[in-house]
C-alpha cells in the first residue's frame, strides 16, 4: 500500500472530511501521519477538509497530495479545492492530481477533453509545472450500488450528495484515449517538456520521494 486517504468526506478518528465542519487533525491523526512517513505511505487529502489538510501538510515530513481534485475557482463543490488550498500544498512540497470526474467539472457530464485541459491549466497556473499530474478517479465498470455507497456517510448512513449520471469527459472516457490528452495539451500550446511532467513524470518523482524507491 503506497497511498492512503486520511478521511473520506466525513469525520473519523484522524480528522475531518470535506463535507463537514472541520475540527482539524486529531492527536491520533498526528501519530498516523508520523507512522505513514516512517513506512513510506503517502498521505492523500483529496476527500479531507481544509483545516485537517493544512495541519497534515504542516505535520508531514514527506510530500502529501490531493491525488484527485479540481479547483473550486472553476466550480464550487465541497470536493474541489480553493486557490489558497492548492497554493498551500504546492508551497509546502506537496502534489496535486487533477481529476476528470465529471460532477466536479464546471460543465458536468457535458464536459469535453478541452474542459478537462482547462482545469489542468487553471491548476498549473497556481501550483507550477512540478507539482501537478493526472488524477483520473476513473470508476468504469461499477454499478449504481457503488455510487450509492460513495454518496452516503461511511457507505451506508446519511446521504451526503447525489452525483446523478457519471460519464467521463468526451474525448477521454477510457484509458485508451489518454493519447488524446497529450495531443490536446500540445495543441493548446504547452511545451512537450511540461506535458511529459503532467502526464506522469511528476508523479514518478514525488512517489519516489515518499516511497524511497
Task: For every predicted segment, state its role.
Residues 44, 111, 169, 173:
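Short, surface-exposed alpha-helical recognition segments that flank or form part
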Residues 71, 140, 205:
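Active-site micro-motifs of SAM-dependent methyltransferase domains
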Residues 35-41, 126-129, 181-194:
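A structural motif corresponding to the C-terminal end of an alpha-helix
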